[in-house]
């Protein structure tokens, strides 16, 4: 069975003005998302599912979905504040979405096969899709609790225009993930890659340290775990009182690992990540895409 690609496209970029999901960066106005979908099709994915906001649907259908017709089946799911389990109500003052794992849950009725989750505004590059696509395609039929994460080498994921936030990963001797620790300020400091610790000190890490770029491989049983844990999350009064509390994928993954419920294989990739974290990054992404086209990695026009 071909795996499915799940794109999380309901969030808006906080650091970069404008609807960055729709920003044309390729020569014919292609978005980063278009390149991800092209790479996924090449890597053997058979269906694309988007999670978006309902009020974004018309724009999305007209500007995005129409171009994929005839290339790959697509489905839309919607993330909203009131999409909560029975018995729970969204606090009246909350405006922030419930987080990446809540977005994943929105696709539970349309995904019945192994799937890969990605952000829509990160350029992951071809090798990353091939690595995760192979892992998912090779899973035995009916596989459960055997997941994966593409571990990008931190030195391949930096911005020239400021710090980036990344989940720094540790794994055991079998290559399985043991922890993901979110570090919100990572950059090169006088040569080495460093993150700022809780005391405000710079701590150096090796360039090839794996980090999470939110590229995960799951089987459909992940939805069951997520539904159960989301109820626990909502039952905790502090998560309801804190209007910015979010149900993130690493929160769920860490719980499953700590309870020995699931294993998450860290898959190495040579891919260099790029994205528009800051407005000043935009031109460098345009230039990098053009150089990949010049090298023959992508055609001039994707779809």
Predicted regions and their residues:
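Conserved core of the sugar-phosphate nucleotidyltransferase
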Residues: 126-215
